[in-house]
Structure formats: structure tokens, C-alpha cells
Amino acid sequence: MLLILLSVALLALSSAQSLNEDVSQEESPSVISGKPEGRRPQGGNQPQRTPPPPGKPEGRPPQGGNQSQGPPPRPGKPEGPPPQGGNQSQGPPPRPGKPEGQPPQGGNQSQGPPPRPGKPEGPPPQGGNQSQGPPPRPGKPEGPPPQGGNQSQGPPPRPGKPEGPPPQGGNQSQGPPPHPGKPEGPPPQGGNQSQGPPPRPGKPEGPPPQGGNQSQGPPPRPGKPEGPPPQGGNKPQGPPPRPGKPEGPPPQGGNQSQGPPPRPGKPEGPPSQGGNKPQGPPPHPGKPQGPPPQEGNKPQRPPPPGRPQGPPPPGGNPQQPLPPPAGKPQGPPPPPQGGRPHRPPQGQPPQ
């Protein structure tokens, strides 16, 4: 559709310029008897069209100025868009049985491809320097809504494949939406604060998110000893242990780093903290978790499925080591270092 619109715009501009030079020397054709009435002759530098043959509907009325006229509609098909003023190009009329394409946009906008028939409507155009991902496929949950500012949106996931790292940009990174049949991804975020993942039903609830330079310890695991709580200050937090599966590297960027949430069927991971922190992607059941987004210009590869993943990437500030895997006793919790005191883990859902 984008290529068609661009080609039509170029053809309309070139034809309008060539017709404007020759119209003053040409005369409008006379009306043929037994055929519908043609358009009246026009004054000025306007292109003149021949009258339509019988059995077809009447074309659009003439326009003034340097305008390009689209072809008259065919019978049995919907009417094309009305004419426009100024040096504008006219798009082709829509085809029957297919949804209407997206309207043209102005400014520095990037529009995704229009949806195919039988599939949900694509996202609406946005203003500003935003980049919109492709529209979701049918039968899958809707991706997160667009965000304002210089934010980039991750592409929707494909079923049956591990999720790759979403794009980076700005002070905020949005995780990709979840797969079908799985819990909904995190809502959009505004400002320099990231939102914690939504609670899973039937599982212990994580403590609510916090603001400032506080670091929250992970909630207690049922039937397992409590891990050491994280320390406050400008230190990234290690991801929580997952029983029987290796942990991927945590994200980087900002003053604090949030570990990815656990997969379904496992206890809830630690909530997010305030500040310039990226949000990890939601969990995918039975599939390896891709690395969460990173800040800055650091490329990251998704981990291969079924293989243990390497140590977390180094950041500017000191990192906390990974807690021991589940099922093994853990040592005493270290005291909090610097910053504000951390909040003890809670098991009640956030109010």
C-alpha cells in the first residue's frame, strides 16, 4: 500500500504539470448524443477529462487550481475519495471486500503496513517521532498501546519461538506482549518509572512497586528457604531463582536494573522499582526467556533454547550476584548497603 500511494503521488504530480501546459491550447470535447453529460469546461490551468462512456456513473466535478484528478469510479465498486485542494496527490479508491487502508500522515511518522482482510485493524497513526510495530495477528492478544515521546515499541511475538530482545531507545524500553493464552503483558509506562508485571492468579502476590532509590526483596517462595534480600542504592538486582531452569542475564541501564519476572507456574518475581529502569518482558510458559531490553547501544543475542545462559552482562555500577537455585538452603541475608532501607517482602496483593 505504501508503494502504491507513493507511485500514485508521483504520477499525479507529473501528470498535473504536463496537463497544465497543454490545457490552454486544447478545447473540451463536445457532448456525444446518447451518452451521459460530460463535465463542463474549466477555466484557468485545469486538466480536462473526456466525458465518461454510457453505462458508467458520472465522474467527479471539476476542481480549481493545480490539482490532479483521479480516474472516475467503476460501477459496482465503492466511490473513491473526494478531490483535494492544493498540490496534493490523490490515492487510489479502495477495493471492495477489503478494509480501508490507513489515512496519510504528516510529519515524521512511520506507519506500519495496513491489515489484511479478516484480520484486526492495525494501530492508528501516532504523532511525533514514534515508531510503530506491525499490527497483531488474529487470535492473539492485543499488543501494548503506543507510547508518547521517543519510545520504541517491541514487535509482537510469534507463537512457538523464543522471544528476542526488543529494541532499545529513550529512557524507557517496553517489553514485548505475551503469547496467546498467556497473561497480559505490562501496561504502557510514562515518565521515568517502570511498571511491575501484573500478578498471576493462584500464585503468591509480589509486593507493590516502589519509587526512589529503594530496592525491594523478592517475595518468599512456598516451601523454599528465603533468599538474601537485595541492597539499596544504585545497584542492579539479580533475577530470582527459577526451579530447574537456568536464568537469563538481567537488563542494564539507568540507576537500577530489574530482573525478568518468572515463568508461569512458579512463584512471583520481585516487583519493579522507580527511577530510570527498563521493564523486563513477560514470561512465556515452557519456552526459554529471551534477554530483557537494555539501555544504550549494546547488542544482545537471544539465548538458545534448552541451554544454560551465561553470567549477566556487566554494568557501570556494581551488580548483585545471582541467588542460589531453588531447592537448596541459602545463606543469611546480607545487610542493606547505602541508599534507603529496603522494604521487607510481602505476600499480600497490592492495594
Curated annotation (Swiss-Prot):
Acyltransferase recorded as keyword: no
Predominant subcellular localization, coarse grouping: secreted
Modification sites for Pyrrolidone carboxylic acid: 17
Domain of life assignment: Eukaryota
Sequence repeats: 53-73, 74-94, 95-115, 116-136, 137-157, 158-178, 179-199, 200-220, 221-241, 242-261, 263-283, 284-304
Stated consequence of mutating residue 49 to C: In allele Gl8; forms a disulfide-bonded heterodimer with salivary perodixase
One BP annotation, GO: defense response to Gram-negative bacterium
Compositionally biased spans, kind Polar residues: 20-31
Glycosylation sites: 66, 87, 89, 108, 129, 150, 192, 213, 234, 297
InterPro entries, per the entry: Pro-rich
Start-end of Pro residues biased regions: 70-84, 112-126, 133-147, 154-168, 175-189, 196-210, 217-252, 259-270, 279-351
Signal peptide from the UniProt entry: 1-16
Chain spans, region 12 X 21 AA tandem repeats of [RHP]-P-G-K-P-[EQ]-G-[PQS]-P-[PS]-Q-[GE]-G-N-[QK]-[SP]-[QR]-[GR]-P-P-P: 53-304
Protein's name in the database: Basic salivary proline-rich protein 3
Record organism: Homo sapiens
Gene it is expressed from: PRB3
